[in-house]
């Protein structure tokens, strides 16, 4: 599948869909913004404001960010899934679907601000394409992963950590447009996941690429993920923010 070249500029439920490569999707460009390390509330407020201000001509965007430690609880989430009340990690209640999850250093978070009507995408199709992008990203590092029916996200396919969750997904659709997105664990302190039932599942093991013996660079994985998201969403793209915003340490 061909994708338009990426340019660098500066600046801070049915399953049917248009066939991949259709003109309708190529006419919907994507802007990729590398936001660096950013407080969760800042990103949350920004994507809500972006969505509220959208017009029919607003280009779609993907935001790549890393958050300081934070738990987020979906709009229908059960607070009982936070098992340790005094963990020292803040909890933010948000308007996405799903239960509780954790974001922290060493994790890639990708927010997808898309006009689904313009892309002729149904929500279930969008979820499938996001999951496929993550599966393809992990495959690039020789990691086999799978979906689970009724449990959005991506899971290790087999081995000692078979069934463990390595990526989470949660979206909000407002006026036909999506925000929130996915998180992919690269090299994290995984202990905060022990204080929750991840995504509402008691005892669910959470892993990162490092615990699967893949010494991957955060930047490299982020670039691979962006490429696979663009390919699966089939949009022309322009990457935003200065290249130095991509600098990241896995230490």
Swiss-Prot record:
Enzyme Commission code: 2.3.1.181
Matches recorded under InterPro entries: aa-tRNA-synth_II/BPL/LPL (IPR045864), BPL_LPL_catalytic (IPR004143), Octanoyltransferase (IPR000544), Octanoyltransferase_CS (IPR020605)
Keyword Repressor: no
Catalytic center residues: 199
Keywords: Acyltransferase, Cytoplasm, Transferase
Subcellular location: Cytoplasm
Record's GO cellular component terms: cytoplasm
Any single biological process term in GO: protein modification process
Binding positions for substrate per the UniProt entry: 96-103, 168-170, 181-183
Main location: cytoplasm
The family this protein is said to belong to: Belongs to the LipB family.
UniProt cross-references to PANTHER family, sorted A to Z: LIPOYLTRANSFERASE 2, MITOCHONDRIAL-RELATED, OCTANOYLTRANSFERASE
NCBIfam families: lipB, PRK14342.1, PRK14343.1
Protein name, as recorded: Octanoyltransferase
Gene: lipB
């Amino acid at each position: 599948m061909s994708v338009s070249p990426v340019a660098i500029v500066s600046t801070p439920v049915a399953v049917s869909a248009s066939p991949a490569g259709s003109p309708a999707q190529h006419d919907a460009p994507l802007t990729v913004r590398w936001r660096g390390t950013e407080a969760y509330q800042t990103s949350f407020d920004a994507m809500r404001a972006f969505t509220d201000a959208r017009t029919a001509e607003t280009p779609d965007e993907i935001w790549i960010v890393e958050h300081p430690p934070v738990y987020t609880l979906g709009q229908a989430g059960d607070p009982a899934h936070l098992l340790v009340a005094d963990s020292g990690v803040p909890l933010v209640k948000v308007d996405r679907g799903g239960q509780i999850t954790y974001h922290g250093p060493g994790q890639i978070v990708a927010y997808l601000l898309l006009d689904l009507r313009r892309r002729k995408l149904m929500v279930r199709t969008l979820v499938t394409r996001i999951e496929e992008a993550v599966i393809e990203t992990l495959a690039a590092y020789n990691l086999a992963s799978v979906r689970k029916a009724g449990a959005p996200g991506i899971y290790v396919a087999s081995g000692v950590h078979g069934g463990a969750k390595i990526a989470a997904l949660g979206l909000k659709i407002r006026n036909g447009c999506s925000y929130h997105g996915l998180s992919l664990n690269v090299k994290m302190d995984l202990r905060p996941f022990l204080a929750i039932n991840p995504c509402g599942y008691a005892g669910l093991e959470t892993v990162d690429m490092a615990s699967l013996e893949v010494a991957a660079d955060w930047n490299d994985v982020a670039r691979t993920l962006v490429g696979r998201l663009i390919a699966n969403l089939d949009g022309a793209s322009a990457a935003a923010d200065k290249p130095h915003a991509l600098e990241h340490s896995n230490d």
